């Protein structure tokens, strides 16, 4: 594409951005044509196709004014986090060590990208902490925890997601559901600490 066409394409792109910013909706093809001094609407369509091909805009040809600016930050770097079985957020179930799948998680979704894994939550014992049945819990691997941390704990080879409290002579794994009682233990193995939740709507 020659320089004049590139310049005109940039004019079209910048005009669309300006209109969306100022008015909240994109311009029509005729408005673009007039604003940037193109001779015909077919010339506008040519530039729109180029912008779409370059990933700068999205269009819906079945609708008028259906032009959307693609956020350049939407193409974010991701990390593939392993999904390790299914644990319970109710009664503990047998811990599953095999990796069932991997999940492409945006790298800016979590602070620490090392030693992460995900577990699918099953049950309602953590609903008052906003953790629902079917959520994917993002876990940072660690064998220690502070009071109040939500952890994945291993109890008799079974894993559970609970809030951790180290009392004077025992460990309390507290559900976030008033209808459920805490689990009291002399000791337990911490597998990891909750750092985030991913939920599909």
UniProtKB/Swiss-Prot annotation:
Residues the record marks as active site: 125, 162
UniProt superkingdom: Bacteria
Keyword Repeat: no
GO biological process, one term: DNA repair
The entry's keywords: Autocatalytic cleavage, DNA damage, DNA repair, DNA replication, DNA-binding, Hydrolase, Repressor, SOS response, Transcription, Transcription regulation
Site (Cleavage): 89-90
PANTHER family: LEXA REPRESSOR, LEXA REPRESSOR-RELATED
Subunit structure, as described in the record: Homodimer.
Name the UniProt record assigns to this protein: LexA repressor
Organism: Clostridium botulinum (strain Langeland / NCTC 10281 / Type F)
């Amino acid at each position: 594409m020659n320089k004049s066409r590139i310049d005109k394409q940039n004019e079209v792109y910048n005009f669309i951005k300006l209109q969306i910013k100022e008015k909240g909706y994109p311009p029509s093809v005729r408005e673009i044509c007039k604003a940037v001094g193109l001779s015909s609407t077919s010339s506008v369509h040519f530039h729109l196709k180029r912008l779409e091909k370059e990933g700068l805009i999205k269009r819906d040809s079945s609708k008028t004014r259906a032009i959307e600016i693609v956020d350049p930050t939407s193409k974010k770097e991701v990390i593939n986090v392993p999904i390790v079985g299914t644990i319970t957020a109710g009664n503990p179930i047998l811990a599953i060590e095999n990796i069932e799948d991997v999940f492409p998680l945006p790298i800016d979704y979590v602070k620490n990208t090392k030693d992460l894994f995900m577990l699918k939550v099953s049950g309602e014992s953590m609903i008052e902490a906003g953790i629902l049945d079917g959520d994917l819990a993002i876990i940072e691997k660690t064998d220690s925890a502070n009071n109040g941390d939500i952890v994945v704990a291993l109890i008799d080879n079974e894993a559970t997601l609970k809030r951790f409290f180290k009392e004077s002579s025992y460990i309390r794994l507290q559900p976030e559901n008033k209808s459920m009682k805490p689990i009291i233990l002399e000791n337990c193995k911490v597998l990891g600490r909750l750092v985030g939740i991913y939920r599909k709507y």
